[in-house]
Design a protein with these regions (language model features):
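Short, Lys/Arg-enriched N-terminal segments with co-localized hydrophobic residues
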Residues: 1-5
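Membrane-proximal alpha-helical signals and transmembrane carboxylates
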Residues: 7-302
């Protein structure tokens, strides 16, 4: 009888042990992950790449101790930066995107997690080479990045672009970026479907060309005023506004295959959306006044 009782207890323990361990593991995985919200890719000397990430701070003490001046033959990491409460900025330089991300994970020490990624910012210098497609595919396939992360090209240093990026209106940075891109896409001043999976598919397609969002910083000290132009018939960095956010998103970076070949202003993107039937609004200027008209996009059969 005692043996039977012991067997029953042992079976119960074996049944519940995986559940207990599973619950503990989930918490440990979250605690040990470096959740990246924004990522930047810049060209570095000697054919290297510099990857800069803005991530949730998590355990700042362990991150700082791991990232302080760590170096290896495969590349190097720079010191951890805390640009705002709740977020940290880390960067690593290596011969490839994968090595740089691996270096960040090894020295933080936390596993790089791109499931919450909202934007990938690529410097224009790098975007005008053939490296863009392979970088995006590595991020998407190997690190399983969020399919909906928006691809952005900037003429600025991409790392500095995400360093100065901050959420406003009390929103989390991830939510702020999500709302920001939705708003501009509804205004038809950025290309439709500029997300990671769509941009990769367009770059690999023989029938369509890819388009990413074009963005730049504006210090508001030297605004270029273009006579006879509407507010959206410009490129970012020269928009006539006084918003607190230093980064401006307007227009598109156009690609032929994996290589960036040109840009469109916000107004040109709006016209493109109108001609392709993807426009939701149209901004018209009459006697200097702007009028926004919502277009009927639903096709009716007769």
């Amino acid at each position: 009888g005692d043996d039977d009782a012991l067997k029953k207890i042992a079976l119960m323990l074996l049944t519940f042990l995986p559940l207990l361990l599973g619950g503990c593991t989930g918490g440990q995985e979250i605690e040990s992950s470096l959740f990246v919200i924004a990522m930047a890719v810049d060209a570095a000397p000697e054919g290297n790449l510099t990857i800069t990430v803005k991530a949730l701070s998590g355990s700042q003490e362990s991150a700082a101790s791991g990232a302080s001046g760590a170096q290896s033959e495969a590349g190097s990491t720079e010191n951890l930066e805390q640009t705002e409460t709740g977020y940290i900025v880390l960067s690593a330089t290596a011969p490839s995107c994968l090595r740089a991300l691996g270096l960040l994970g090894a020295t933080t020490p936390r596993t790089v997690n791109l499931s919450q990624l909202q934007e990938i910012v690529i410097s224009q210098t790098l975007a005008e080479t053939d490296a863009t497609l392979s970088i995006l595919k590595q991020i998407h396939a190997i690190y399983r990045a969020n399919d909906e992360a928006v691809v952005v090209v900037t003429p600025d240093h991409a790392g500095d672009f995400i360093r100065r990026q901050r959420a406003v209106l009390g929103l989390r940075l991830s939510k702020y970026l999500e709302v920001l891109f939705e708003h501009y896409e509804q205004l038809d001043v950025i290309p439709p479907s500029p997300n990671l999976s769509a941009v990769i598919a367009a770059m690999e397609s023989a029938a369509t060309d890819a388009a990413a969002v074009y963005a730049a910083g504006n210090d508001f000290d030297n605004i270029l005023l273009l006579q006879g132009k509407t507010d959206i018939d410009r490129l970012p960095g020269h928009l006539p506004r006084t918003a607190p956010a230093p980064n401006e998103y307007m227009g598109a970076a156009l690609f032929s295959g994996p290589r960036m070949t040109g840009t469109l202003t916000g107004n040109e993107v709006s016209l493109f959306c109108l001609m392709t039937g993807k426009a939701s609004t149209r901004v018209s200027v009459i006697d200097g006044a702007q009028y926004k008209t919502r277009l009927q996009t639903r096709v009716k059969r007769r």
